[in-house]
Amino acid sequence: MKTLTASLIKEEDMWVAKCPEVGTVSQGASVEEAVANLREATELYLEEFPRKINIRSIFTTFDVENVKA
């Protein structure tokens, strides 16, 4: 078992979840549903395309100018 990262973004009425280590993406109506769907998608992907996963993710923030909210 590996612990992977889920990055979530709210888009309109859905949550979009991404796994940066594998590249899988899924969505759900709630954070919990999006993560559960991402887990399933990632497991299915890795069953079809097995590979060694190096977990070396680094997340940071950055500022941008002239963004209209």
Residue ranges and their predicted role:
Residues 1-4, 36-69:
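Short, charged, surface-exposed hinge/linker loops at domain edges
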Residues 5-21:
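Short aromatic-glycine-(Arg/Gly/Cys) micro-motifs in beta-strand/loop hairpins
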Residues 13, 23, 65-67:
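Intrinsically disordered, low-complexity regions of eukaryotic proteins
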Residues 20-23, 44:
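Flexible, active-site-adjacent loop/turn segments at secondary-structure boundaries
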Residues 22-31:
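A short, exposed loop/beta-hairpin motif centered on an aromatic-Gly-Thr core
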